Amino acid sequence: MPSGQAFAATAVITPLADTYITQQFPDGNNAGATELICGAQGGMAGNARNRPLFKFDPADSIPQGAKITGVRFTIVITKAPPAGIDSRFGLRRVLRDWNVTQTTWKLRLAPSVAWGAQGGAAGTDYSNAISASALISDEGPYVYDSTAALVADVQSWLDDPATNFGWILISDQESQAFSARRLASANHGTDLPALEVDYTLPVLPLIESPHLEQGLFSLQFDTEAGYCYAVEFRDSVGTGPWTTLTNVCAKLVPEKVLAKDPDPVSSRVSRFYRVSATGPAR
């Protein structure tokens, strides 16, 4: 991409892992299930609650330093009861780690790391706030439209993968029989859950006006609002680590930045500089 030209793209991401935990079989692990269950099934299962878990890896598809601008989450309901109760299925950000081959209604990590409460505890295991919700009724696809919270979740996972514990899906009528629906999992073969992520990369900074004055080298470059930049140098063109000269964040408006190297030119044989966008400003 040429300097000065912005870049926008959309990535479609399928789950890195998904499963569901069920109150009906509190010690059971459902890794590899082709369908996930959300809500209470009724019948012989009674009012036992079911909660799917999803984990996506945006860093595998989206470059570091990207700014997330939109997120849409799609699920496909594969089975609905004939007289089912409609409800809103809410996505909540998970706050603690879980393992797809170990997690159960009781445990998030085997053999003994429990959820804060069985099935997960709001405020401890998952967020009190709902990142997005959709009214679920009949079979078919459902799209969770982009919200500020969905964007913030995915941006956080991209910037700091160590915070990525995914989402839990909870029906707002999960205590009511026949609120449950089955949905295709990552193992379904078709109709997989999907995360559609819009993102932009900052305008590549163009170094302008390299200048030598009183034995000191300086350079200028234009920033884009909402991004941070690093000015770095090293004394060999091909080898050795880059050293940070300065970091700049332009949070509100674009601006022209002057970066000056305090080391006199006379103290070295050569020096090479680069300017890079390091990510969205916070």
What spans do the regions from the language model cover?
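Exposed beta-strand and adjacent loop surfaces of beta-rich binding modules
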Residues: 86-90, 192, 226-230
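Short, composition-biased motifs enriched in small/polar/acidic residues
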Residues: 201-282
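Flexible, small-residue-rich N-terminal segments that precede or flank a structured functional core
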Residues: 7-61, 172-174, 186-192, 198-200
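A short beta-strand element within beta-rich, extracytoplasmic domains
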Residues: 56, 67-80, 195
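Acidic glycine-/aspartate-rich tracts in secreted/extracellular proteins
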Residues: 59-62, 78-82, 95-100, 151, ...
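Beta-strand-rich interaction/scaffold domains
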Residues: 12-17, 80-156, 163
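Sec-dependent, cleavable N-terminal signal peptides
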Residues: 1-9, 281-282
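Ser/Thr/Pro-rich, low-complexity mucin-like regions
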Residues: 150-189, 199
